[in-house]
């Protein structure tokens, strides 16, 4: 067989090696490759900067490791300072490379696909970005990028002005740019977009960055643009401005849109979203009352695969006070034949909407989440009954008020869930507070494919463990019920699990009956068994401790 006899490997092979190291996120080896030879430097540095946003220096993800590592304070402080300096060197090299082709060894900014100005802002505002580190960052050719200001009688960096200046310089050279993230001032983004023909995604802190022609710039220059995330947009005219931006875009541009936090978008924006018939994922958080009253304006979005709607207040009664709107929303959701993942949070009429939509033969969900409803309610009963019509469901997440329920309320809920034999994930948070062990047993016997089971409840004995042991795919079991398990019963349950299929198993008893407390030695013994035999974890909290915790954060 012929073999390659040259002194160095072909460039194609070197590039493939670097690509594989990049896929493995092995930045240490890539850096060594860059230092090893001139022929290796180009593909190694290209890969390093293409993926720089995943590097430890960029994410500063080893920061806690330095603090926890054994050693004296001076050594750890020096290691931490060196690690932080790598972060500043990364951003300095990116910025310098945008000035002239010969300022840096390679034109690093030309390799970049993602510009995350959130990360740059975090670095500039970090308490370690002072003194010699700040001076070194802005030294030489970067002096024009230093915008100092006085804040509380001390000199700091004007982060907004600095980010704008660096962004203006870098985007002039980032010809491969696919994503722009960060808090960007109004007026800058259209120019940056026009320089980025490969742009696909933007993640912006405030929607105001989109004004003054960002939509037109995308329409004229960015054929691949499709994803937009906004953190907030509280301007009084946000609805009009966002609708104008969406109208500036070519029809069917967006496939993904997410509004994360507080905003004032509403009817006009919803109607403009309907122009984008390829929109597959729509997530609208913290909707105001006017927006909820105009949800029917979203009826043009019929290709939705994932829909998440969050009512900021939870007080709007559209079924009672705006029934025409309510019926239009039901009709819209029922017509979305591609809808697979549906989430409603704090909607007063959430159960009423779902009780009708779930009956639609056009809707075949795989994931469903409802948060912020009351179980003791006629519409809740209708919703729980309607669950049985969605046998394609693989994940159900329910959270609400489970107090003062009747036996019928709980029985209807359990019966509806027991029909979902394809379920892999079931989370019942607070809605199941008055579950008995019979309810938990019924679910365990009816849902053989469960992998993740989270439920609250009243007092439950070890009688629930044998049925739970029949769940051969279960990987996570979290019980916020008042469990009454002896250590030998817990061990018997754990020993019945399959060490291969249930590897990584986690058992969390988060509200154990104080009369069934386990000593620290017993807990350690159980933890060691589950670690050694299942590579898993055991959590144990007594009820009196759980009572003081906020399960809403779990």
Write out the residue ranges for each language-model feature.
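Structural motif corresponding to alpha-helix initiation and N-cap regions
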Residues: 98-102, 164, 186-187, 211-212, ...
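Short alpha-helix boundary/capping motifs
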Residues: 30, 34, 160, 208, ...
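Leucine-rich solenoid repeat modules
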Residues: 2-5, 12-20, 271, 281, ...
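N-terminal adaptor/linker regions at the entrance to substrate-recognition repeat cores
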Residues: 2-318, 337-341, 537, 554
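Short, structured segments at the rim of ligand-binding sites
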Residues: 319-325, 478
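Short secondary-structure boundary micro-motifs
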Residues: 152-154, 326, 426
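Short secondary-structure transition/capping segments
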Residues: 60-65, 320, 464-465, 488-490
């Amino acid at each position: 067989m012929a073999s390659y006899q040259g002194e160095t490997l072909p460039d194609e092979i070197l590039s493939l090696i670097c690509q594989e190291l990049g896929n493995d996120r092995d930045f240490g080896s890539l850096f060594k490759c860059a230092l090893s030879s001139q022929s290796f430097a180009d593909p190694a540095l290209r890969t390093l900067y293409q993926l720089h946003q995943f590097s430890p220096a960029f994410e500063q993800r080893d920061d806690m490791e330095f603090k926890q590592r054994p050693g004296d304070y001076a050594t750890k402080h020096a290691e931490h300072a060196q690690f932080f300096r790598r972060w500043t060197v990364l951003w300095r090299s990116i910025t310098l490379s945008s000035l002239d082709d010969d300022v840096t060894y390679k034109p690093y900014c030309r390799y970049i696909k993602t510009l995350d100005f959130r990360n740059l802002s975090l670095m500039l505002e970090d308490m370690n970005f002072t003194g010699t580190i700040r001076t070194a960052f802005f030294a030489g050719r970067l002096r024009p990028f230093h915008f100092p200001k006085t804040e509380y009688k001390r000199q700091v960096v004007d982060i907004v002005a600095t980010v704008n200046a660096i962004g203006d310089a870098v985007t002039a050279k980032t010809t491969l740019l696919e994503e722009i993230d960060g808090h960007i001032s109004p007026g800058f983004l259209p120019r940056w977009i026009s320089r980025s023909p490969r742009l696909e995604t933007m993640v912006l802190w405030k929607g105001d960055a989109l004004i003054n022609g960002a939509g037109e710039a995308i329409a004229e220059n960015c054929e691949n643009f499709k994803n937009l995330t906004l953190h907030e947009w509280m301007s009084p005219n946000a609805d009009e401005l966002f609708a104008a931006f969406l109208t500036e875009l070519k029809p069917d541009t967006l496939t993904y849109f997410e509004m994360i936090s507080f905003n004032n978008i509403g009817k006009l924006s919803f109607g403009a979203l309907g122009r984008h018939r390829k929109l597959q994922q729509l997530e609208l958080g913290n909707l105001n009352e006017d927006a909820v009253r105009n949800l029917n304006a979203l009826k043009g979005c019929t290709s939705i695969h994932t829909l998440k709607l969050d009512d900021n207040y939870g007080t709007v009664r559209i079924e009672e006070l705006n029934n025409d709107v309510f019926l239009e929303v039901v009709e819209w959701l029922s017509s979305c034949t591609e809808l697979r993942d549906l989430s409603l949070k704090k909607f007063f009429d959430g159960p009423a909407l779902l009780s009708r939509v779930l009956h639609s033969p056009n809707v075949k969900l795989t994931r469903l989440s409802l948060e912020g409803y009351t179980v003791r309610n006629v519409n809740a009963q209708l919703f729980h009954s309607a669950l049985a019509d969605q046998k394609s469901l693989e994940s159900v997440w329910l959270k609400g008020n489970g107090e003062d329920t009747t036996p019928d309320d709980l029985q209807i809920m359990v019966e509806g869930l027991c029909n979902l034999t394809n379920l892999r994930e079931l989370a019942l948070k607070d809605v199941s507070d008055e579950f008995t062990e019979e309810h938990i047993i019924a679910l365990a016997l009816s849902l053989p494919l469960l992998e993740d089971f989270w439920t609250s409840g009243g007092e439950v004995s070890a009688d629930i463990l044998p049925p739970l042991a029949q769940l051969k795919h279960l990987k996570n079991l979290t019980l916020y019920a008042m469990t009454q398990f002896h250590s030998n019963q817990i061990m018997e349950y754990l020993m019945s699990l399959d060490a291969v299929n249930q590897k990584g198993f986690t058992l969390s008893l988060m509200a154990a009956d104080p009369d069934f407390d386990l000593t620290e030695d017993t807990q350690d013994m159980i933890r060691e068994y589950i670690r050694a035999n299942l590579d898993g974890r055991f959590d144990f909290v007594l009820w009196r401790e759980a009572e003081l915790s906020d399960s809403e954060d779990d």
